[in-house]
Amino acid sequence: MASPPPIVEYAVFFTILAVLVFVAGEYLAWVYREQANSDHRPPGYLSWFERLDEIFTPIENGLYRLSGINPRREMTWKGYLKAVLVFNVCIWVLLFVVLMFQDALPMNFVGVGGESWDLAFHTASSFTSNTNQQHYSGETLSVFTHTFGIGIAMFLTPATGLALMPAFARAFTNKEDPRLGNFYENVVRGLVRFLLPISLLIAIILMAEGSVQTILGGQLTANTFTMGIQNIRIGPHAGIEAIKMFGTNGGGINAANAATAFENPTPLSNLVLTLAMPIGTFSAIYAWGAWVGNRSHGVAIVAAFFVIYMALTGVAVVGETGTNAGMVVTGNGLHVDQTVGNMEGKETRFGPTASAIWGLSTTGTTNGGVNSMHNSWTALGAFSLLFAFATNNISNGVGTGLLNILMFVILTAFIGALMIGRRPQYLGKKLEWQEMRYVFVVILVLPILVLIPQAAAVVYQGAIDSMNNPGFRGFSEVLYEFFSASANNGSGFEGLGDGTLFFNLVNGVQVLLARYVPITAQLAIAGYLANKKVSPESKGSLDTDTPAFVGLLIGVIIIVSALVFLPALVFGPIGELLSGGI
């Protein structure tokens, strides 16, 4: 059966996404209503959300008693930050130990060995920071490691991000009150009410479509037509895949990730998984407006990032449904039919359009899971991926994405107020040098972490030897690797041999700094703002829910991203495109 025209696939995807973002956004706003110190109530036709308390509250209370959490103990921003760091250090230690000693742990059905110390450092750092960058093949981990190491981290790290959102909302809903809530309560609510139930629903859909789900076997033996006997690793694919995509994780059980039929078997499963990536991030933006008592402001921010997301996705679709210059053969060479577009590195059950939409969904969030090989994309398609990184992953990750987006929103409000000669403020809180210095720290983290290592890598012989492609594409491979780590994304241009000591250590440090430096600065901003009075809006205040504000926000994001990263992009995908490369 022929695939629908690209414009139809594109339109259907974004229409469904817009509807789901509204419903999930109202639901998420309800989940953290009290924790955000908000008066939000869902619309009447969604009031059934409130009846879910009868199911979730007993589970949460049981977890509080079991873990000794006192949900009523409020924390200042410093206490909140301490809890975040302690919680994540525990996740890192768990992962590091499991990875190093998986050969001595149970459920190691095919006898895989433990990882080297540098690879275990990178893997533990990557999965603790919700990056899930893999310098190993997924098949080299045991079922125990996938289930009780990687799988647990895939739930706890997005829960960490979710727990940051109501704390930051308190910065604007509090009136001279430094308390930001209880981190552990917010983690539990995010797990019980958001991540677990929706991931379970996605996993059921995947199993219905044919995705594998087992913890009892290590591999499947197949007698193939052309390769003889082939051993294929199997495990808890459906369960891991669900939270991998919905929790903006990305690391797969198989090396080919969601391009494999065990993880992503059908076009329907592909649509569900593609939608799962941005739903959590965009619903958080919508929920922000509900928490601060201005739904239209949340819709305005969603609209701004939807415009960027849709535009870059359109560029990717154009690039990948066009021809691959490297496949155009002159003379008597083998002719490659490219009527459907660039099929190199793509699955025939998805095609170039669905692969392009997935590609921008995975780089437009901190997901990083792939259903096609990004290093086989055209120069135009590769540019769209790298520019999505330059915007700090468009909508970014679950929880942390909202906070990173709000740094651009606050910067836009600050610039906009100065442009019209008004005192800078945002949602009734004055913006002063204490907050703005931390906003600039967050915005500068990405370029510092990307460009300095990039400059070192292109002159360091060990890094140069890892490049499998010359020229512009080789430069793009390294740039993509550092973008992926520093934006907490995790995907890769797999032509790069990144499983070396250099890349393990550099990327391992990058993912940690990219995660925890912004969190520290953002909680400090929340602490400063929570202590301030709320200034009533006046006629002279900057409106943050108008098309003009949306346009200004888009302009700030693109200008900041383009000015900082344009030279690097010129040496990579832009140079390749202009030189007639693939």
Swiss-Prot record:
Disruption phenotype: kdpFABCQ and kdpFABC deletion strains are only able to grow in the presence of K(+) concentrations above 60 uM. It is found in: Cell membrane. The keyword Cell membrane applies. Induction: Up-regulated in response to K(+) limitation. Induced under desiccating conditions. The keyword Transmembrane helix applies. Pfam families: KdpA. The chain crosses the membrane at residues 11-31, 81-101, 148-168, 195-215, 272-292, 298-318, 379-399, 401-421, 439-459, 551-571. Part of the high-affinity ATP-driven potassium transport (or Kdp) system, which catalyzes the hydrolysis of ATP coupled with the electrogenic transport of potassium into the cytoplasm. This subunit binds the extracellular potassium ions and delivers the ions to the membrane domain of KdpB through an intramembrane tunnel. The Kdp system is essential for growth under K(+) limitation, and for survival under desiccation and salt crystal inclusion. This is Potassium-transporting ATPase potassium-binding subunit. The gene is kdpA.
